[in-house]
Amino acid sequence: MLYIFNSFDNMWVDFIEQTKSFKVSVNNYFYYLNKIKKLFTYLNDLRKHILKKYVYTINHKRIAINYLYFSMVTGLSGAALATMIRMELAHPESPFFKGDSLRYLQVVTAHGLIMVFFVVVPILFGGFANFLIPYHVGSKDVAYPRLNSIGFWIQPCGYILLAKIGFLRPQFWRYYDKTSFSFPFLEKMKYNQYKEYKNDYLFYLDFLKKEITDDHSFFWKARKVIKLPQYSVFSFVPLKLMMWKTMINYPESFWYAASRVVQSRRKKVFVTKCSARTLTTAGWTFITPFSSNIKYTGVGSQDILILSVVFAGISTTISFTNLLITRRTLAMPGMRHRRVLMPFVTISIFLTLRMLATITPVLGAAVIMMAFDRHWQTTFFEYAYGGDPILSQHLFWFFGHPEVYVLIIPTFGFINMIVPHNNTRRVASKHHMIWAIYVMAYMGYLVWGHHMYLVGLDHRSRTMYSTITIMISMPATIKVVNWTLSLVNGALKVDLPFLFSMSFLLLFLVAGFTGMWLSHVSLNVSMHDTFYVVAHFHIMLSGAAITGIFSGFYYYFNALFGIKFSRMFGYMHLIYYSGGQWVAFVPQFYLGFSGMPRRIHDYPVVFMGWHSMSTAGHFITLIGIMFFFLMIFDSHIERRAATSSTLGLPRWYKRISYYIFKIRYLQHNKAKMNGIPGSTVRLMLIDRHFAEFEVFKK
């Protein structure tokens, strides 16, 4: 009996313990369930916060920072394409592309267009212009904030199309590259036999079936027979569901079908042995007839390229229209005609915005005419039917050469802000500096022909373009001399923006001198198609323009993000990036003197030494870019507060005059701005030593 009671007691104890453990497990379950619920609530709130802060925002400062982040991403993709190019050229016998010269040309095309249209332009006119102009003209925001947001979100559309050109394999586009960052957008449709049945019997697109196709040469005589394995089939789906999927997954099918329908009226078959239909080999300059004729370039890729440039042009047009209207309608009373109150960087940006307003429609008209020539059988650039292929080069370079000044003149503004800040004295002859950039910009409209010495221009045109190109060195010389004089007799404070400015000055001098040599017709004829030209414009754009942008970025870093930048990573960025530029592009001058042609993926072994050095310089530059992103991450993680110490006691005696200068300079500016009727003054912090007073309406 005792045994039974003990057993019952043990069973009861076990039951109580199991109940307790069950309660504990239930409590733990609800505890972790509550934690998961809080986590999902936090993630949902974070998603709403990110959408509200970055996607739905119409604030000019946030949109400007979005432009900067976007340009960082596109810059990395452009650098990846440049790495492919340098790895191909590091050694003869085509080590990277395995002899595929067309693929090499496609990568070069995408690299050039990404760097010009989706890196430098968004940084300057989407980032800095959107952030600074409302401050400097005295408005609370731009004239059309929602239009400003639309202009930003058009940029990624064009970039995705262009990245699709650069990061895909040379096969037909139904086979996408899984190593590409864009592969989620390129998932191919599943094979459907029923759709193929309807495609064959309802639409009877027999020329899109898998079959052997004759290849015709330029003389309309069959030379050989090529096989097109697994040729893509036009999928039959409803129109509303078909359009986006077709352009993303099967662009060659869509454009090839449309072009063949029109071309059949002229009884021509545009199939060639020159290039694969999905490759863009016309280059970033849209050389005709390669870009205007399906006979020479990709059936779908060149059209996607044209559409990408149109998207970039629409975004740029929205930006410069919005900012120019802001300047015209929202500027302070008295500010509109008193240029002396406006900072130099804003004067430079407004000048280049007006330049963009005149040259962007020209490029848009040129690429639209190319699209018409390709698909609607117009003959703007078709010589056999009365067109002029040289006209497209005139249109492109009328845009292309002023575009160089559009990219370099805003960096002049950054230098003119940094030099007086670091040297405790104003810029030498500010009015001459302003007139110099105006003369440089207006003369830039007259020299586009020096890119076309080899197309058959007569000697009078060559002489005119050469003379004006030489004359354009005078305003550039005025600027360099005034910057040098601004450094004399001052209490110089050497910091990171100032060192980037000096690096910019050296790179700009070398790029300008080498450009002046190219202005001479006799030298240009022998050097035009060599690596000398590649070195010249890369030192001007990748060297001078990007270095000037970095100087402005570090100068306005505290104003942009409200924190101080990491000095250690910043100085490493300066050393490696500037050093890498010299090591990468100076050897290319010697390659040009030796006769190494550009746009060629292979070369004799005699050029391997200079090419290897140039490739090493490229990787040194990539290390500098790595330090730049480390600086961004470290600055945002540490979040050191940007505090003003303008009135602090200086450590060194030579800084006494520096602080006195800044105090007097700020007091002078504040007195001038308070004199404008209907205005008040606010403070925009630049760095821990310096700030600017800006005006805005009451």
Curated annotation (Swiss-Prot):
Keyword Coiled coil: no
Crosslink (1'-histidyl-3'-tyrosine (His-Tyr)) position: H401-Y405
Single Gene Ontology MF annotation: cytochrome-c oxidase activity
Keywords: Calcium, Copper, Electron transport, Heme, Iron, Magnesium, Membrane, Metal-binding, Mitochondrion, Mitochondrion inner membrane, Respiratory chain, Translocase, Transmembrane, Transmembrane helix, Transport
Domain of life assignment: Eukaryota
GO biological-process terms attached to the record: electron transport coupled proton transport; mitochondrial electron transport, cytochrome c to oxygen
Textual note on the cofactor: Binds 2 heme A groups non-covalently per subunit. Binds a copper B center.
Cross-referenced PROSITE patterns: COX1, COX1_CUB
Binding site for Ca(2+): E88
Binding-site positions, Mg(2+): H528, D529
Catalytic activity, as annotated: 4 Fe(II)-[cytochrome c] + O2 + 8 H(+)(in) = 4 Fe(III)-[cytochrome c] + 2 H2O + 4 H(+)(out)
Necessary cofactors: heme; Cu cation
Name of encoding gene: COI
Main location: mitochondrion
Protein name per its UniProtKB record: Cytochrome c oxidase subunit 1
Pfam families (UniProt xref): COX1
Subunit structure: Component of the cytochrome c oxidase (complex IV, CIV), a multisubunit enzyme composed of a catalytic core of 3 subunits and several supernumerary subunits. The complex exists as a monomer or a dimer and forms supercomplexes (SCs) in the inner mitochondrial membrane with ubiquinol-cytochrome c oxidoreductase (cytochrome b-c1 complex, complex III, CIII).
Enzyme class label: translocase
Record: residues binding Cu cation: H401, H450, H451
Secretion signal span: none
The keyword Transferase is assigned to this record: no
Protein residues bound to Fe(II)-heme a: H111, H538
Family the entry assigns: Belongs to the heme-copper respiratory oxidase family.
